[in-house]
A protein has these predicted regions:
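Aromatic "clamp/platform" in nucleotide-sugar-dependent glycosyltransferases that forms part
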Residues: 234-236
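A short helix/loop element that forms part of the nucleotide-sugar donor recognition site in Leloir-type
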Residues: 141-156, 294
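A short, active-site helix/loop in glycosyltransferases that binds the activated sugar's phosphate group
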Residues: 103-126
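C-terminal alpha-helical cap of glycosyltransferases
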Residues: 284-291, 304-328
């Protein structure tokens, strides 16, 4: 372990304007590093003075690798921090640059599902499971007034039930069907892909359905905290921070099959595996009435994330800096 001197890390990340609907996982990574008194550097000319390079956007690998070789710096990759590292094809998730990941020094992920996905994708670099996403109750406090921000924005009564539906553009029809099946519940469809303004026009004829392209920063905390449930229609959902925040808020999650974060959902919250059809989701929502939310499992998981010394991301970084560098 290195000394307690202030760490300087180079954060290699490039925002993709096409990713407007995605949750900004890299923002939570920045917040985590700052909470650990880590200095974040983004100017390439400062790499020489950094302790390590954190590679979030894989297409920047060639550029940072040259600097890493010149100044003898290690590269730790965080592939699930940027949706641009993947593409979807026929309901499959495809890693866009396996070669880059096999040339870094270490890969950090947050779940077993993410690690298994990389191994199945022929990634042979050592992979470490460590948490940098801190759940809402460990990084901020939300006042009773702030909890109403989400409802006020959409004009939802505070005593009404609202359900957040997360999915890509092609899942919107399922949200339409759900809203028509349950007129007494408000559904907010958050498009986590590039989005379609046409869908917003459609909601004008469905009074209990709203459409958003991505979740606004000012609405996110109150939306998660006040939701009656979260429905995830995207099979390759990868944003662990959303899962942790739902767990911290005791919000049940309904999902079909989520390989990347499914185990963690089931370990920490009321989880209902549902059919993909709107009817199947509707029946699962009905089951929630007979399935009281338990705070025991969520408390256990969040305490583990807070206290588990073996899974602290900052310690992983420090250990990697001092370990011998292997030639790739």
């Amino acid at each position: 372990m290195i000394s307690d001197k202030t760490l300087r890390v180079f954060l290699a990340y490039k925002k993709d304007t096409k990713d407007v609907g995605k949750f900004p996982t890299v923002n939570f990574l920045r917040d985590y590093l700052r909470s650990e008194n880590v200095e974040i550097v983004t100017d390439y000319k400062d790499i020489e003075s950094c302790d390590v390079i954190l590679l979030v956007t894989l297409k920047l690998f060639s550029k940072v690798r040259s600097a890493a070789k010149e100044f003898n710096k290690k590269i730790i990759a965080i592939p699930f921090g940027d949706h641009a590292n993947f593409k979807k094809k026929k309901n499959e998730l495809i890693l866009t640059n396996i070669k880059s990941l096999n040339q870094v020094d270490l890969i950090c992920v947050e779940t077993k599902g993410q690690m298994e996905f990389l191994k199945k994708s022929s990634v042979v670099t050592p992979i470490n499971i460590s948490w940098f996403s801190k759940p809402m109750n460990q990084r901020t406090s939300i006042s009773s007034l702030e909890k109403t921000t989400f409802n006020k924005y959409f004009g939802i009564s505070n005593d009404s039930r609202s359900i957040i539906v997360l999915g890509c553009t092609d899942s919107f029809k399922k949200a339409q069907s759900l809203a028509r099946m349950v007129p007494g519940v408000t559904f907010v469809f958050v498009d986590i892909s590039s989005g379609s303004l046409k869908h917003r026009w459609i909601t004008e004829n469905i009074p209990n359905l709203y459409y958003e392209i991505g979740m606004r920063d000012e609405l996110y905390p109150s939306g998660i905290a006040s939701a009656s449930a979260i429905v995830i229609l995207e099979r390759w959902f990868m944003d662990m921070i959303v899962i942790l925040d739902a767990i911290a808020s005791n919000v049940p999650i309904l999902a079909v099959d989520i390989p990347l974060v499914g185990t963690e959902i089931q370990a920490g919250t009321d989880f209902i595996a549902t059919e993909e059809s709107p009817v199947g989701i509707y029946e699962s929502l009905q089951d929630l009435k007979h399935n009281p939310i338990s705070d025991v499992a969520s408390s256990d998981l969040l305490t583990k994330i807070k206290n588990d010394e073996n899974h602290k991301f900052i310690d992983v970084i420090k250990n990697e800096i001092v370990s011998p560098k292997e030639e790739k």
